[in-house]
Amino acid sequence: MVPRVWSLMRFLIKGSVAGGAIYLVYDQDPLGPSDKSQAALQKAEEVVPPAVYQFSQYVCEQTGLKIPQLPAPPKFNFHIRDYWNSGVIKVMSALSVAPSKAREYSKEGWEYLKERTK
């Protein structure tokens, strides 16, 4: 009984995290135009560190553990949106050629196996 409940809990937690990520991408539109991506990144830089601090304080109070102070996040001296968009473009191009590359590699592997079995 306990393994089934634990399995269900894991499924629900993973599903809620995935659903939250999908909602966040839909709501903030980080894969859209560069100005929206930059605005979403700046908003995340402002919101995430205080939320992590509050959560760590809550965990400390509830469990009695002492969590060391995290270092400040690094400041970037370049426009991350340029690199972000180029990364998205590269990933999407790799995904678009993946089926043809998989077919090509499987064909080469099949030919190799035919040669070896002769």
Curated annotation (Swiss-Prot):
The chain crosses the membrane at residues 8-26. Disulfide bonds: none annotated. It is a single-pass membrane protein. It comes from the Eukaryota. Keywords: Membrane, Mitochondrion, Mitochondrion inner membrane, Transmembrane, Transmembrane helix. GO terms for cellular component: MICOS complex; mitochondrial crista junction; mitochondrial inner membrane. Residues 27-118 are mitochondrial intermembrane. Residues 1-7 are mitochondrial matrix. PANTHER family: MICOS COMPLEX SUBUNIT MIC13. Component of the mitochondrial contact site and cristae organizing system (MICOS) complex, composed of at least MICOS10/MIC10, CHCHD3/MIC19, CHCHD6/MIC25, APOO/MIC26, MICOS13/MIC13, APOOL/MIC27 and IMMT/MIC60. The MICOS complex associates with mitochondrial outer membrane proteins SAMM50, MTX1 and MTX2 (together described as components of the mitochondrial outer membrane sorting assembly machinery (SAM) complex) and DNAJC11, mitochondrial inner membrane protein TMEM11 and with HSPA9. This is MICOS complex subunit MIC13. It comes from Sus scrofa. The gene is MICOS13.
